[in-house]
UniProtKB/Swiss-Prot annotation:
UniProt xrefs under Pfam families: GHMP_kinases_N
Identification of the protein by name: 4-diphosphocytidyl-2-C-methyl-D-erythritol kinase
UniProt family annotation: Belongs to the GHMP kinase family. IspE subfamily.
Record keywords: ATP-binding, Isoprene biosynthesis, Kinase, Nucleotide-binding, Transferase
Entry's Gene Ontology molecular function annotations: 4-(cytidine 5'-diphospho)-2-C-methyl-D-erythritol kinase activity; ATP binding
Its EC number(s): 2.7.1.148
Enzyme kind, highest EC tier: transferase
SUPFAM superfamilies reported in the protein's UniProt record: GHMP Kinase, C-terminal domain, Ribosomal protein S5 domain 2-like
Pathway annotation: Isoprenoid biosynthesis; isopentenyl diphosphate biosynthesis via DXP pathway; isopentenyl diphosphate from 1-deoxy-D-xylulose 5-phosphate: step 3/6
Provenance organism: Fervidobacterium nodosum (strain ATCC 35602 / DSM 5306 / Rt17-B1)
GO biological process, one term: isopentenyl diphosphate biosynthetic process, methylerythritol 4-phosphate pathway
Reactions accelerated catalytically: 4-CDP-2-C-methyl-D-erythritol + ATP = 4-CDP-2-C-methyl-D-erythritol 2-phosphate + ADP + H(+)
Function as written in the Swiss-Prot or TrEMBL entry: Catalyzes the phosphorylation of the position 2 hydroxy group of 4-diphosphocytidyl-2C-methyl-D-erythritol.
Annotated residues for binding of ATP: 92-102
Length: 272
């Protein structure tokens, strides 16, 4: 009989503190330039691996359809273990918070932890299943370029004091594919400052410049009533859409959520 494992972990949501698109690539993807940050909103995953024939069973509190975890498991191509995943979704789906990508990263990290895949394989699988997934393998704070696969980890902003945010969750989701299709070339590269500059302003807690640099290109293609809500917040706080929406955030001293220094956190690991 082989070994069985149980891994319990949290996978944290992310914000794009700024998000610009620099152009469309020859492969059809868009070149992004962004500052990513994990926040304290998280999903919970309870993963059990035991001897079997390569089956994956996912149980969740919401209807997750053809989940990204299936794509990960297909690429792993393991035929001597069965996996059961209990997934408690707290991160809204389709809102630009990276919940599915964080789940995929958590699953990949768990499979690496038990020795089914190597660290090198982890990154390759992450790059194949979703543009945001590689970030969550590093987590915390990072400058992200390319189509999301170029990760430049930087010292977590949590090392420079507390940052808190409020999230605003409209009751509709926005298709990322559709949002990208609406972008116009003349909008590319128009962010007021670079992600590197914005990161430095966060480090020095220069909130006036943080407010100036909090930018998201996708605000150009969202419904007008949503944009008006963001701009109303922006009069007093750094505020923007995250991802392609529909969630938007505002940096506030009394915000409900905090910046966190990791994308995935293992809370329990059992071997039998």
């Amino acid at each position: 009989m082989g070994e069985s494992y149980r891994i319990v972990l949290r996978t944290y949501a992310k914000l794009n503190l700024c998000l610009d698109v620099l152009g469309k690539r020859q492969d059809g993807y868009h070149e992004i330039n962004s500052l990513f940050q994990n926040i304290s909103l998280f999903d919970e995953m309870d993963i059990t691996l035991s001897d079997g024939k390569g089956k994956l069973l996912i149980n969740s509190n919401v209807n997750i359809g053809n989940n990204i975890l299936n794509s990960v498991w297909e690429l792993v191509n393991c035929d001597n273990k069965n996996v059961y995943v209990n997934l408690q979704k707290n991160i809204p789906m389709g809102g630009g918070l990276g919940g599915g990508s964080s789940n995929a990263a958590g699953f990949i990290i768990a499979l690496e932890k038990v020795g089914i895949i190597s660290k090198e394989q982890s990154l390759k699988i992450a790059q194949k299943v979703g543009s945001d997934v590689p970030f969550f393998l590093f987590g915390g704070t990072a400058i992200v370029k390319g189509r999301g696969e170029v990760i430049l980890p930087v010292e977590p902003l949590t090392n420079f004091g507390k940052f808190k945010v409020d999230l605003h969750l409209p009751n509709f989701s926005i298709s990322t594919k559709e949002a990208y299709s609406k972008l116009k070339a003349e909008w590319f590269g128009k962010a007021p400052i670079t992600p590197e500059e914005l990161y430095d302003f966060y480090k020095t807690r220069n909130f006036e410049m943080i407010k100036k640099g909090t930018y998201n290109i996708f605000e150009r293609v969202i419904p007008m009533d949503l944009l008006e809500k963001i701009e109303s917040l922006r009069r007093d706080f750094p505020a923007a859409l995250t991802g392609s929406g529909s969630t938007y955030f505002a940096l506030k001293e009394d915000g409900k959520y905090s910046f966190v220094p990791k994308g995935v956190e293992i809370n329990a690991f059992e071997k039998s």
